[in-house]
């Protein structure tokens, strides 16, 4: 009986985790398609989001962008290079430390970002209930998880 309960409980946790992953993948898939429709790779859209979300009194360094994008420093440099060639971002030396580069959106980057943000919010609105339900199920499954 206990094995049946454990397997039922484990099955419920797996189901909750799978549903959450599915809902996230659906949104991420939408994001990739929407970005490509605007002529940019999804990773460049994500880069622009990180830059735009910086606190107003700060500027985006390559190190900060790498951390927020969960990329290696050299991969972030390459991503910024591609976005700069596309006219989405501009890079300048940090006046306080000339070895550091600071990255900001260009006006073209801001236009594309604003359009994509609006599309993403419109897409996300009807999915919120599914995502919230999946998160609540995960939370409940985690709370019922036996402690190791």
Predicted regions and their residues:
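Short, charged, intrinsically disordered terminal tails
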Residues: 140-148
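N-terminal helix-turn-helix DNA-binding core of bacterial DNA-binding proteins
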Residues: 29-72
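Pre-recognition alpha-helix immediately N-terminal to the DNA-recognition helix
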Residues: 19, 26, 46-50, 111
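Charged, amphipathic alpha-helical coiled-coil/dimerization segments
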Residues: 81-139
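Short, hydrophobic-biased segments on the C-terminal half of alpha helices
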Residues: 62, 80-81
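N-terminal leader segment of winged-helix/HTH proteins
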Residues: 1-38, 86-88, 147-148
């Amino acid at each position: 009986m206990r094995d049946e309960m454990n397997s039922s409980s484990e099955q419920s946790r797996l189901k909750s985790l799978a549903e959450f992953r599915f809902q996230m993948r659906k949104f991420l898939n939408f994001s990739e398609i929407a970005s490509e429709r605007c002529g940019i790779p999804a990773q460049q859209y994500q880069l622009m989001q990180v830059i735009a979300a910086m606190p107003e009194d700060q500027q985006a360094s390559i190190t900060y962008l790498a951390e927020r994008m969960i990329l290696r420093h050299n991969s972030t440099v390459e991503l910024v290079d591609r976005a700069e060639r596309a006219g989405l971002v501009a890079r300048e030396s940090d006046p306080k430390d000339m070895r550091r580069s600071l990255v900001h959106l260009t006006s073209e980057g801001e236009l594309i970002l604003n359009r994509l943000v609006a599309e993403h919010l419109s897409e996300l609105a009807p999915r919120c209930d599914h995502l919230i339900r999946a998160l609540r199920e995960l939370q409940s499954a985690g709370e019922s998880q036996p402690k190791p």
